[in-house]
């Protein structure tokens, strides 16, 4: 919608800051560890295939990818990580899903609850907002580098569900099972991806005003700064004036 930016575009802008914080490698490695608990062969483990594809998108070195797989399968120590999701609400009644990877469930739930409360949000019961989201692969590319025909041809032929123009950014949605194949096809076509990850896509979004948007971004930043938090998903559209402040 004109004047507002979707969550994936917000995440893309924030990703430039996240990269500076050096947390992307840790997130990618933890996701591989968790995924590899379901089996160390990506050919028969769709989640591991997707995790490896996302790790490659942030340039995680191959040796770190291999070590993370071995930690997940138990071949190396360090795989004692639990995957937990929390659901709740932020300012303006915005729905939030917080995905964490932790070795201490009690510590993490206490910290997430404290952050939500401090920033005008609240923890909800399991399932309170999860039904509002669908897990998808999301790949973004710079809209100025590639034409619609180039992106559509490479992505849709590889099995992507949808290609969208989100204000100067091409946003590609895939089923989880097709995510790795689409990422590989774009790479083979010589396309440079700004981001490639599994995300929770809201079925509907809520527009917020600038003041609420800033409060929400402070909440999201605080959650993402927590070492145990992997991802934060939300269903709000951010006014462009607030999005510009993320640059």
UniProtKB/Swiss-Prot annotation:
Source organism, top-level taxon: Bacteria
Q: Where in the cell is it found?
A: Cytoplasm
Where is the major localization of this protein? cytoplasm
One biological process term in Gene Ontology: regulation of DNA-templated transcription
Q: Does the keyword Transcription apply?
A: yes
Q: Name one GO molecular function term.
A: DNA binding
InterPro entries noted in UniProt: Integrase-like_N, TACO1_YebC-like_2nd/3rd_dom, TACO1_YebC_N, Transcrip_reg_TACO1-like, Transcrip_reg_TACO1-like_dom3, YebC-like
Q: Does the keyword 4Fe-4S apply?
A: no
The membrane-spanning stretches of this chain are none
List the keywords (alphabetical): Cytoplasm, DNA-binding, Transcription, Transcription regulation
Where are the stretches annotated Disordered? Answer: 1-21
One Pfam family here: Transcrip_reg
Q: What GO cellular component term, any one, is given?
A: cytosol
Family, per the entry?
Belongs to the TACO1 family.
Write down what this protein is called.
Answer: Probable transcriptional regulatory protein DvMF_3201
Q: Which organism is it from?
A: Nitratidesulfovibrio vulgaris (strain DSM 19637 / Miyazaki F)
């Amino acid at each position: 919608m004109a004047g507002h930016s979707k969550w994936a575009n917000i995440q893309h802008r924030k990703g430039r800051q996240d990269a500076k914080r050096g947390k992307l490698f840790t997130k990618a490695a933890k996701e591989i560890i968790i995924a590899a608990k379901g089996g160390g062969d990506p050919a028969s483990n769709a989640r591991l295939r997707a995790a490896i594809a996302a790790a490659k998108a942030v340039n995680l070195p191959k040796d770190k990818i291999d070590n993370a797989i071995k930690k997940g399968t138990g071949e190396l120590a360090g795989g004692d990580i639990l995957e937990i999701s929390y659901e709740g609400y932020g300012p303006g009644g915005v729905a939030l899903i917080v995905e964490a990877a932790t070795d201490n469930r009690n510590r993490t739930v206490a910290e997430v609850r404290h952050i939500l409360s401090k920033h005008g949000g609240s923890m909800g019961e399991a399932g309170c907002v999860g039904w509002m989201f669908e897990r998808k692969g999301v790949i973004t590319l710079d809209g100025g580098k590639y034409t619609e025909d180039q992106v559509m041809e490479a992505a849709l032929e590889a099995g992507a569900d949808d290609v969208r123009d989100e204000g100067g950014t091409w946003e590609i949605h895939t089923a989880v099972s097709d995510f790795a194949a689409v990422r590989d096809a774009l790479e083979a076509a010589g396309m440079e991806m700004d981001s490639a990850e599994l995300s929770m896509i809201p079925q509907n979004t809520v527009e917020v005003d600038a003041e609420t948007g800033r409060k929400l971004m402070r909440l999201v930043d605080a959650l993402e700064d927590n070492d145990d938090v992997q991802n934060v998903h939300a269903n709000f559209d951010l006014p462009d004036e607030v999005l510009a402040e993320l640059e």
